Amino acid sequence: MPLISSIVLLAYVATVSPAARERMGPTIRLVSLVLSLAMLVLTTAMFFGSQYIEGTLDWTTLSFGSFNYEYSTVWIESLGIYWSVGMDALSFPMVWLTTFLLPVTIVATWNEKNAAVYFPLVLMMGGALIGVFVALDLFMFYVFWELTLIPMFFLILKWGGYDRKYASQKFFIYTFTASVIMLLGLVTVYFLQPEGLSRAGTWTGRTFDIPTLTAHAQAANAGGAWFLGESLQKIL
């Protein structure tokens, strides 16, 4: 399994069934800590080992639009949706900081009583956040973005301190509204892009691939054209 995908999915190992977590008891703390440390070690190794694993690519010489540890496989081919991940010199520090903060958070809240729920939620949030940083597909980015909000909502609702129920309600309203607006934006980008940008096998001829859309936007801007063509100009 590719390294980036392994780091993302490691965070979800602790999210077993509630009954299994209850049987694990205090062990869930240790399991969560080990998983978070494994994610940190893998991420750190990816920085120092990039030139050996990726050949000539290095973090200091990456050009715009180039990614280390890039991996892509079909997810929903008919719609041009792929499980596509990669890291550049901007996203890697964010991923590393996330994997660094996970074990710090677990150690700092080690004595949390409801550990069977709390620690898996923390790992789920961390894994989804990493997915946001490494996603090279707009649909995949949106899915991971939504996955960060679910554990955050329950963490606020249960461990948010004073007036946490009101805070969780506001969090839900704001994030739900923002998610709908973001979804409308992604759908707009998808349907207003010219056909033919996608790989073979899609029904619509369109794509969610971020590098492809970025390259098309640069080419369109260089030619003095709007990124999404005349359709967007009519809307504006």
Where are these regions (language model features)?
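Conserved, non-catalytic sequence blocks in retroelement Pol enzymes and Pol-derived host proteins
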Residues: 112-114
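N-terminal amphipathic, basic-rich helices that act as targeting or association modules
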Residues: 1-15
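Tryptophan-centered motif/residue detector
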Residues: 66, 73-75, 110, 145, ...
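Membrane-interfacial alpha-helical segments at the cytosolic side of multi-pass membrane proteins
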Residues: 5, 98-106, 154-156, 185
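Transmembrane helix-loop-helix hairpins at membrane boundaries of multipass inner-membrane proteins
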Residues: 11-107, 116-120, 195, 200-231
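Hydrophobic residues within membrane-embedded alpha-helical segments of Major Facilitator Superfamily
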Residues: 5-8, 39, 94, 101, ...
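Alpha-helical multi-pass transmembrane bundles of energy-transducing inner-membrane proteins
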Residues: 12, 16, 22-28, 124, ...
